[in-house]
Design a protein with these regions (language model features):
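A general structural signal for short secondary-structure junctions and capping/turn motifs
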Residues: 9-12, 143-149, 187
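Short Gly/aromatic-enriched secondary-structure transition segments
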Residues: 33-40
Length: 217
């Protein structure tokens, strides 16, 4: 899987769902008088729910076919099945990054979908991937205190179209060693402009595709 090691893996889950708690930031208060009433700071807290899904894959191999073959096909079949498993993991992770999170803020309430805030969505603007868009994404992580200065790892998914956009942008391929390496190898994977770039050819969309940038935690 391209993405599995780049998120927090909860491992084996018992049951049809699991939850994760989230909490907003809190700040210190000034003490202006002695023996005054305690001022409580109530952070924004919530619970997010992840629903489990089932998938399977079965490929038949007739016993008569095995006898007719010099080589055992099961090794190749197994490798293709394992590759399908990894692709499905990536598809599920990508859909979760794009989709709404099920969240509630009190015990008696019900879970409802919470989409990514509009302020964290960079519009296509009729252009492909540009240096300006990458810098804007980088700025968002810094604004949200969710970059390497806070111990985070940042990733961005790219496909062949984005590869073409980046390699064709002279403002990105005319300066440093990484730019030279990009042009020599025709590849943009690795870390640059603050992101670790992850190849993924299943970005959704037709004329306009949607990629995602995220922090591991």
């Amino acid at each position: 899987s391209r993405f599995e090691s780049k998120i927090i893996n909860r491992g084996s889950i018992v049951g049809s769902s699991f939850t994760a708690n989230d909490m907003g930031t809190i700040e210190m208060n000034s003490v202006t008088n002695r023996y005054g009433d305690t001022e409580w700071s109530i952070p924004d807290v919530g619970v997010r729910q992840a629903l489990m899904s089932d998938y399977d894959l079965a490929v038949p191999v007739d016993q008569f076919d095995l006898l007719k073959l010099i080589a055992n096909p099961q090794g190749d079949y197994l490798q293709r099945c394992l590759a399908a498993v990894q692709r499905k993991k990536d598809a599920v992770i990508y859909a979760a990054l794009k989709g709404s999170a099920l969240r509630k803020t009190d015990e008696s309430g019900s879970f409802s979908g919470q989409a990514l805030p509009a302020g964290q969505v960079i519009a296509a603007g009729g252009t492909g991937m540009t240096k300006a868009k990458i810098i804007t994404a980088r700025k968002q992580f810094r604004t949200n205190e969710a970059d390497e200065h806070n111990g985070e790892e940042q990733y961005i998914a790219y496909d062949a179209g984005m590869l073409e956009d980046v390699l064709s942008d002279t403002t990105l391929t005319s300066a440093d060693f990484m730019a030279v390496k990009m042009l020599q190898e025709g590849d943009i994977s690795g870390k640059w402009l603050g992101f670790k770039w992850v190849p993924y050819e299943a970005l959704t969309g037709t004329s306009t595709k949607t990629t995602m940038a995220w922090a591991k935690t």
